[in-house]
Amino acid sequence: MIALLIALFAAIHAPAVRSHGYLSVPTARQYKCFKDGNFYWPDNGDNIPDAACRNAYKSVYYKYRALDLESGAAASTAQYMFQQYMEYAAVAGPNYDDFDLIKQRVVPHTLCGAGSNDRNSVFGDKSGMDEPFNNWRPNTLYLNRYQPVYQMNVHFCPTAIHEPSYFEVFITKSNWDRRNPITWNELEYIGGNDSNLIPNPGDSLCDNSLVYSIPVVIPYRSNQFVMYVRWQRIDPVGEGFYNCADLVFETLDDECRYAQMAKVVRSQLQKHKLDARIDHNDEESCWRARKSNYSSFFNPGF
């Protein structure tokens, strides 16, 4: 049944360029790799600047070279993984609200690639995004030393708006081993029900005038962790979108040192023509940066 729906989806959308959306705050792995660029030459990805993105590309490229696919075709397969940053999608059918179905049949593996690990499938091979590299580049969340949770507005940038729809947001559990790919058993649900489509508040990584804002409360993690977001369309085809973003917590005392954060805040406020609100006291500026939770001025980790 799911295979039939995927085939129908492909037939309907084949003539057009498909585009849907991606995590902009925090920033999806595949979007960071796309924004870095330099993945078209040479074929083997040697010019890709970021180590994890380069490794992800090479994992797909050499996978198909090992199957005797010629270099250009293997490169196109790996490039597609970055090019289609807005379409990390899977089709569930009318039972999209059956979470066991999602976990067991729709995206049973390769979670950060939306279950896509075959170049001949509708959504291609995005398995490089799921590789458990230790050098995925995280977004940094700054919090007070005694702050046990972090409140923020997650942004999902729609390149095509789909309504009705809903979101589910997860993070990896505190005992997750980064040396292994993410599985559903290693994810903890933290929210998504209060999502809203709002005017873009200044998210520089989203070109759309509208953005989905999803308020969540993130429990503290002592090590680098992953946020996993599902954006599910409510329709008979049941197309959903699945993105991974890497995160790490830093305490203000250890990382910010007030003056550093004040400089960042002043720079961002000036950029958005809000100079009148700037307080040049370093401690106060740093405190305001933490209180804002970077919902508008989030450090994208580029």
Curated annotation (Swiss-Prot):
The family database entries (Gene3D superfamilies) matched by this protein are listed as:
chitin-binding protein cbp21
First-listed, main subcellular location of the protein, grouped into a coarse class: host cell
Task: Look up the signal peptide feature and give its range.
Answer: 1-19
Stretches assigned to coiled coil: none
Stored Pfam families? LPMO_10
Q: List the disulfide bonds.
A: none
Q: Where in the cell is it found?
A: Host membrane
Q: Please give the InterPro entries that the UniProt record associates with this protein.
A: Cellulose/chitin-bd_N, GlcNAc_Chitin_IntDeg, Ig_E-set
Keyword annotations from UniProtKB, A to Z: Disulfide bond, Glycoprotein, Host membrane, Late protein, Membrane, Signal, Viral occlusion body
Q: How does it assemble?
A: Homodimer; disulfide-linked.
Task: Provide the function of this protein.
Answer: Component of the virus occlusion bodies, which are large proteinaceous structures (polyhedra), that protect the virus from the outside environment for extended periods until they are ingested by insect larvae.
The record's PANTHER family line, in alphabetical order, gives: CHITIN-BINDING TYPE-4 DOMAIN-CONTAINING PROTEIN, GLCNAC-BINDING PROTEIN A
Q: What's the protein here called? A: Spheroidin-like protein
Query: What organism is recorded for this protein?
Result: Autographa californica nuclear polyhedrosis virus
- Report which gene this protein is encoded by: SLP
